[in-house]
């Protein structure tokens, strides 16, 4: 009994694939939880001489836990050279007229929550965090703790440094932050990575299995063609059923050089193209394994028009033809063979057995013996 055919995994294949698909679906849902990102419109205003300059643009992104509302105020950076506001004792130069103000803080040094907390404790209405140096105007939605009535926005490093330089020059800079557009992000980078790996794996295995099926189909066609050619070739070789009184079964007759057994009545012999004959059950596997006559080394398959490839191993050929070359004749074949005159051992066979060191490969059997076999035309189908 084959456990691969009766095991529980074979009978519950649909359930197994359904469970596998459900697991992948749950992982995908966990990886691609939809998240909304809100952009921020920022109207930056400052005085240059007697002129008021303003710059309006969608240059910021609200934090994930930030409240979404309009806020305006004076932009105030932390005091000192360190602008990350990670120190709980960080102070800000507050406006003299106590107007609302918004903290301008550099990213890095600590978590976003810590920066927002420090600015909130100092009375800021909002927090603008600008990105690392070298990141240009890149922004992303920050993850932080939610604070009541505090607007949190990230802007690019370039824009943040422009505002900071103006403030350090003594320019009074104000900003108005308004809620911009909503963007829904369904795919985060974890899910994208997962999908890339999964797609590449599926593509590889699909290509691998298609190639295996293609190669197997070609091999199957080649083996079928070879089977037909071998059956046709073996059918061209003469066969004979020995009888009582034949010279081959006499006590002084030669034996089969493959099994070293003497020929007996009712045994089937196959006669090769070189006129040597052997037990059919002995010579058929020998030809499949070697392709030549065991006595004169004549290439039997080549003489029959069969071109064997190197990869066609002898074991594979024997397994392939084991069910294709029957070991016994049908009743009709036996009846026809019984009507033939007894086969005679060729002089070549006798010569090899008596004088093994002086084998004459090119010799031909006497004409009298050839005429004694006028009906060597029976074929093994």
From Swiss-Prot:
Pfam families: PA (PF02225), zf-RING_2 (PF13639)
Post-translational changes noted in the entry: Auto-ubiquitinated.
Domain PA per the UniProt entry, residue ranges: 65-167
Region Disordered, residue ranges: 340-381
Protein keywords: Endoplasmic reticulum, Membrane, Metal-binding, Transferase, Transmembrane, Transmembrane helix, Ubl conjugation, Ubl conjugation pathway, Zinc, Zinc-finger
Residue ranges of the TM segments: 186-208
Biased composition (Polar residues): 344-363
Membrane topology listed for this record: Single-pass membrane protein
GO biological process, one term: ubiquitin-dependent protein catabolic process
Function: Has E3 ubiquitin-protein ligase activity. Plays a role in male fecundity through the interaction with the E2 ubituitin-protein ligase UBE2J1.
Protein known as: E3 ubiquitin-protein ligase RNF133
Species assigned in the record: Rattus norvegicus
Lineage: Eukaryota, Metazoa, Chordata, Craniata, Vertebrata
Gene: Rnf133
């Amino acid at each position: 009994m084959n456990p691969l055919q009766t095991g529980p995994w074979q009978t519950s294949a649909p359930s197994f694939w359904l469970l596998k698909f459900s697991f992948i679906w749950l992982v995908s849902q966990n990886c691609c939880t939809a998240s909304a990102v809100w952009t921020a419109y920022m109207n930056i205003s400052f005085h240059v001489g007697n002129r008021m300059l303003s710059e309006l643009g969608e240059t910021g992104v609200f934090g994930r836990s930030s409240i979404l509302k309009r806020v305006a105020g004076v932009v105030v950076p932390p005091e000192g050279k360190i602008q990350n506001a990670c120190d709980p004792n960080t102070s800000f130069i507050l406006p003299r007229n106590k107007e609302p103000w918004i903290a301008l803080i550099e990213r890095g040094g600590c978590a976003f929550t810590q920066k927002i907390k420090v600015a909130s404790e100092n009375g800021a209405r909002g927090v603008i965090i600008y990105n690392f140096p070298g990141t240009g105007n890149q922004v992303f939605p920050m993850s932080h703790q939610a604070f009541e009535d505090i607007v949190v926005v990230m802007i690019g490093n370039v824009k943040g440094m422009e505002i900071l330089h103006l403030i350090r020059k003594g320019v009074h800079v104000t900003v108005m932050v308004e809620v911009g557009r909503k963007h829904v992000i369904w795919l985060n980078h974890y899910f994208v990575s997962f999908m890339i790996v999964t797609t590449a794996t599926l593509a590889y295995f699909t290509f691998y299995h298609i190639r295996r099926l293609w190669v197997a189909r070609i091999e199957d066609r080649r083996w079928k063609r070879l089977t037909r050619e071998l059956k046709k070739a073996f059918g061209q070789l003469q066969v004979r059923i020995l009888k009582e009184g034949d010279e081959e079964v006499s006590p002084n007759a030669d034996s089969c050089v493959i099994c070293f057994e003497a020929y007996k009545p009712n045994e089937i012999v196959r006669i090769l193209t070189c006129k040597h004959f052997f037990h059919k059950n002995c010579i058929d596997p020998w030809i499949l394994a070697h392709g030549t006559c065991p006595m004169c080394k004549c290439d039997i398959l080549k003489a029959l028009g069969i071109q064997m490839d190197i990869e066609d191993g002898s074991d594979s050929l024997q397994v392939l033809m084991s069910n294709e070359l029957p070991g016994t004749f049908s009743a009709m074949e036996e009846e026809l063979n019984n009507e033939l005159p007894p086969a005679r051992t060729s002089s070549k066979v006798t010569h090899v057995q008596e004088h093994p060191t002086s084998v004459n490969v090119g010799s031909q059997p006497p004409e009298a013996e050839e005429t004694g076999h006028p009906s060597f035309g029976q074929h093994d189908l």
